């Protein structure tokens, strides 16, 4: 089932009690308060969950190389940006938390020639498009942030515009089937929870079904050409994360035509 933009907006109003960008400011305030704790907890190499569950398959699907110009979405303290820089890529990394970007610049200062850190709002298409530089991005990546973003449609639309025709977008997010234990799986809704024990403030999570996420990807012009469901430690049959690779539908058509 595919929802129109009006359907999704009405669902947001009914479940979240908000308009198009409401909720973003509250979420931003929370992340401003959590920024220093998050930077300390994630450090230079990220935490065990990211290192073992998220990063391996994200990197496999992204396949970063020295020729790449990569957009790192909701970059946090920039530890994955530096991981990409270590592999020779040039990176533009952004987050909506000014404090987080300050910490990222400080922590990743040795990669200043390869990484440009910016403050931008992932729910604001215009804000993202202002990250356009002299060349198109070859790739885009988002590690465990889709579920923290109030409205992902502007992000998907903007990323599609910023990528070169053969570009790819890889994102990892909570698996909506197994992390959000709810009787209202099909209904978009938000809730408060923590990501790391001890963080100062509970963050806001935005639950979307797989079909809602994928249909927004398709509507933006993407197709899916890579997908993983990843488990953590002893939960070998319960995937906590899904990792998706998107590419332009036009690029796929061109590829099929040339074959």
Where are these regions (language model features)?
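Acceptor-substrate binding/catalytic loop of class I
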Residues: 173, 196-211
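A short glycine-rich, Lys/Arg-flanked "PGG" loop and its adjoining helix->strand segment in the class I
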Residues: 153-168
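A short SAM/SAH-binding and catalytic strip from SAM-dependent methyltransferases
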Residues: 138-152
């Amino acid at each position: 089932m595919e929802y129109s933009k009006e359907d999704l907006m009405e669902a947001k109003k009914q479940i979240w009690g908000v308009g198009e960008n409401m909720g973003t400011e509250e979420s931003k305030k929370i992340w401003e308060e959590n920024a220093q704790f998050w930077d300390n907890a994630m450090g230079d190499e990220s935490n065990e969950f990211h290192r073992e569950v998220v990063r391996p398959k994200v990197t496999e699907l992204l396949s970063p190389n020295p020729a790449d110009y990569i957009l790192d979405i909701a970059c946090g303290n920039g530890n994955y940006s530096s991981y990409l820089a270590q592999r020779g890529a040039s990176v533009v990394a952004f987050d909506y938390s000014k404090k987080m970007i300050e910490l990222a610049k400080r922590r990743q200062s040795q990669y200043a020639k390869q990484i440009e850190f910016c403050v931008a709002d992932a729910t604001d298409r215009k804000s993202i498009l202002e990250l356009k530089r002299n060349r198109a991005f070859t790739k885009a990546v988002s590690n465990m942030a889709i579920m923290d973003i109030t409205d992902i449609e502007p992000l998907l639309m903007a990323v599609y515009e910023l990528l070169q025709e053969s570009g790819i977008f890889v994102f990892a997010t909570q698996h909506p089937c197994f992390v959000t234990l709810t009787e209202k799986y099909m209904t978009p809704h938000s809730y408060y929870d923590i990501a790391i024990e001890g963080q100062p403030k509970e963050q806001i999570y935005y639950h979307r079904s797989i079909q809602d996420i994928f249909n927004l990807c398709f509507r933006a012009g993407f197709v899916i050409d890579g997908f993983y469901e990843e488990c953590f430690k002893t939960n070998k049959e319960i995937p906590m994360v899904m990792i998706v690779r998107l590419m332009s539908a036009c690029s796929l058509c061109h590829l099929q035509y040339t074959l």
